[in-house]
């Protein structure tokens, strides 16, 4: 009898033990999967950053689906003041990571938090700008991808090759943009080598830009060049329109400018850059610290030419540039 009665008790005890062991596993299985919240922002209402689609596609390829295991809060903003308000809102709401697409949004994000990870793109020199301690060891909560300010000299070389009569160049510079001094030095050195005379004008607002173009005399300059990222981000449509009205060629700082009439674009392949940034986002969400992820330079560049714009200016694209071009728009 004793041994017979122990059988049911043993079975009951085993059932209870298994129940205690399985219950946490069942609860874990029923717990909803983590939905990562990411804030992405950019300043410049008339366009979106060219690396945005590449970033989204890269995240999707890595298994992130917006609305399921990730929520992307994308904001395209008027100015840096709006970026500061947005960054503080995200920090208050507890986002898991911030993606900042140019210096104005990087400054806003950095000012808002020292804890939330920040991945930046479209920044020429993050060390000089004070965003990171070094390329190899960023420190803090920021990392990302730097541009190459020396691309400006290559852009001038291509400009001169496309426009053989280029002698005097209207250069628009924003003195309030921290990158302007650095860019100016590169452009001035390249211009001296190419024997170009720079007609430099300081502008910060749309009214300033209108005034400078309105004061130009016929034949005073042969083309237009920008050296301040803030101008490139904020005044795309205005500068293209004013240059076109005065029949002045200019290169585009983004491929988008070429689709709207700029003569050419030479620079970073931004869709590829967005894909690389997605990998950094993935690493951070999986536990990597921004301080330990080195700032990287873009690895892919492209030359985009606008044949219709060249014809409108009476220019013939040299065969050497046609061979180098990744795309020729017609």
Name these PLM-found stretches.
Residues 1-330:
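Short hydrophobic alpha-helices and adjacent helix-cap/hinge residues
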């Amino acid at each position: 009898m004793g041994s017979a009665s122990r059988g049911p008790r043993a079975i009951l005890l085993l059932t209870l033990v298994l129940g205690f062991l399985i219950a946490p596993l069942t609860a874990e299985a029923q717990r909803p999967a983590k939905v990562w919240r990411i804030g992405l922002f950019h300043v410049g209402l008339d366009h979106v950053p060219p690396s945005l689609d590449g970033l989204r596609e890269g995240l999707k390829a890595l298994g992130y689906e917006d609305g399921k295991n990730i929520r992307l809060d994308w904001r395209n903003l008027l100015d840096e003041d709006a970026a500061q308000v947005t960054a503080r809102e995200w920090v208050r709401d507890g986002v898991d990571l911030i993606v900042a697409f140019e210096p104005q949004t990087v400054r806003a994000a950095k000012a808002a938090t020292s804890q939330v990870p920040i991945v930046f793109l479209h920044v020429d020199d993050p060390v000089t700008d004070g965003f990171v301690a070094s390329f190899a060891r960023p420190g803090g909560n920021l990392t990302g991808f730097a541009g190459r300010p020396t691309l400006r000299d290559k852009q001038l070389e291509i400009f001169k090759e496309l426009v053989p009569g280029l002698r005097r160049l209207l250069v628009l510079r924003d003195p309030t943009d921290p990158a302007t001094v650095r860019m100016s030095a590169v452009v001035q050195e390249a211009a001296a080598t190419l024997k170009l005379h720079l007609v430099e004008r300081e502008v910060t607002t749309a009214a300033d830009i209108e005034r400078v173009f309105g004061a130009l005399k016929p034949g005073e300059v042969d083309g237009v060049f920008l050296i301040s990222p803030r101008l490139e981000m904020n005044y795309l449509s205005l500068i293209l329109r004013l240059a076109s009205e005065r029949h002045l060629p200019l290169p585009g700082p983004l491929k988008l400018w070429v689709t709207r009439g700029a003569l050419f674009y030479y620079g970073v392949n931004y869709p590829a850059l967005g894909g690389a940034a997605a990998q950094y986002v993935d690493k951070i969400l999986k536990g990597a610290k921004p301080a330990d992820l080195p700032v990287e330079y873009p690895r892919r560049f492209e030359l985009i030419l606008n044949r219709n714009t060249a014809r409108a200016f009476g220019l013939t694209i040299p065969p050497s540039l046609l061979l180098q071009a990744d795309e020729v728009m017609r």
